[in-house]
Amino acid sequence: MDKLADLNYTLSVITLMNDTLHSIIQDPGMAYFTYIASVLTVLFTLHKASIPTMKIALKTSKCSYKVIKYCIVTIINTLLRLAGYKEQVTTKDEIEQQMDRIVKEMRRQLEMIDKLTTREIEQVELLKSIHDNLITRSVDVIDMSKEFNQKNIKTLDEWESGRNPYEPSEVTASM
């Protein structure tokens, strides 16, 4: 286990792989050498990272199937990202979690729509009652005794000087 996580051991294996590749491929003009070396380096790094992680996870976890499935899905997603794909591989558990989240969000939106619909119905009923109260009813005789502007009306006899103060008078101006 110590040998798997040792940095010097990892670097020596990478150096050994590079030396082996250089000795196999003597042609300096080979165009695909860098790509082959990159892929082999990535595969080796995945191997070095996944094996100890999986061993530790299997020892500490009670459900080894889920751990192995999760590790394999993670490795496949990493390889897909390295290849340039945007898609990801998902497990059924992740799909079920996403579906539960979507269903929960749909329920929340339906409850909100129901609340809004109830409020709109209440507003329409309120507007109808306001409209019913505002409808003018025809009255034969209008009682003016309660009107604001009719309380202080004085007749011509009740005025002090006997003339209407609101009536315009003639004004002469000197020139």
UniProtKB/Swiss-Prot annotation:
InterPro entries: Rotavirus_NSP4 (IPR002107). The chain crosses the membrane at residues 29-51. Ca(2+) binds at residues 120, 123. Residues 52-175 are cytoplasmic. Gene3D superfamilies: 1.20.5.430. One of its GO terms (cellular component) is host caveola. SUPFAM superfamilies: Rotavirus nonstructural proteins. Plays an essential role in the virus replication cycle by acting as a viroporin. Creates a pore in the host endoplasmic reticulum and as a consequence releases Ca(2+) in the cytoplasm of infected cell. In turn, high levels of cytoplasmic calcium trigger membrane trafficking and transport of viral ER-associated proteins to viroplasms, sites of viral genome replication and immature particle assembly. The secreted form acts as an enterotoxin that causes phospholipase C-dependent elevation of the intracellular calcium concentration in host intestinal mucosa cells. Increased concentration of intracellular calcium disrupts the cytoskeleton and the tight junctions, raising the paracellular permeability. Potentiates chloride ion secretion through a calcium ion-dependent signaling pathway, inducing age-dependent diarrhea. Binds 1 calcium ion per tetramer. This is Non-structural glycoprotein 4. It comes from Rotavirus A (strain RVA/Human/Japan/KU/1995/G1P1A[8]) (RV-A).
